[in-house]
Amino acid sequence: MFPIDFCHIPISIIKRSAGRSAVAAAAYRSGTKLTNEWDGMTHDYTRKGGIVHAEIMLPAYAPPEFADRSILWNSVEQIEKARDSQLAREIEAALPRELSGQQQLALVRAYVKDNFVDKGMCADFAIHDKGTGNPHVHIMLTLRPLKENGQWGAKCRKAYDLDENGQRIPDGKGGWKNHREDTTDWNDKGNVEIWRAAWAAYTNRVLEAAGQPALVDHRSYKRQGIDKIPSVHLGPAASQMEKRGIRTDKGEVNRQIAADNKLLKEIKARITRLYRWSKDEAEKPQTQQSS
């Protein structure tokens, strides 16, 4: 059986309440200079290295000008009025080192188109690779649906509560009981598992087509039934420090995990050898001892 690696796929929401902006995130991911028209701040990441490819993919009804990164994300910033607005969804995924740059790009395009763009989301992705063995992709996705006229639609709408006969329920104040519901299913909790499983499936398909035996699985080692301790995610700051030879706390944790996994592998190998020896001994013909 080919080795199966756990692929860590963080999925998060870019929120204004956390001091973040979609424009700043897009500038950093793409290594460009963008000005956020909502707060007037300019974010210049043109000196950032390791940006292999950046691209915007648009769904039906999206205005052609949204192919411009500044226009797209400033449009998002302007439509979201609240200080605690959710601005974008971000997905990060490691790219197989066994694939060429063109194969990695084809993988990302197919995954993004089928899972997000065809569902109505605008996608802005950037592939990062500094040549240190950690190629990965950042995928930013819009959260609002687009109307047929190219304008942003509503994220949610008012829906009336109904009784068993399908009739509206009075609220006792001259109105009707109601609740808010999303206009799309993009926020369904089950999507996290679906999107992660899809990434693993698309990746394995491309690896197989390229004649590579390696496989990936979006499930944790525990869910796979594999006795292996997963490493912790370093994050950009710790990664940069480690690359410069500066040892970090997270780096130390990962080094200890690697040592523990090596020891665990050795112990399992010894147990396997002991099991086989005991099985062989049990199968040997028994000789009677003379009294």
Language model features with spans:
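N-terminal nicking endonuclease/strand-transfer module with a His-rich metal-binding environment
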Residues: 1-291
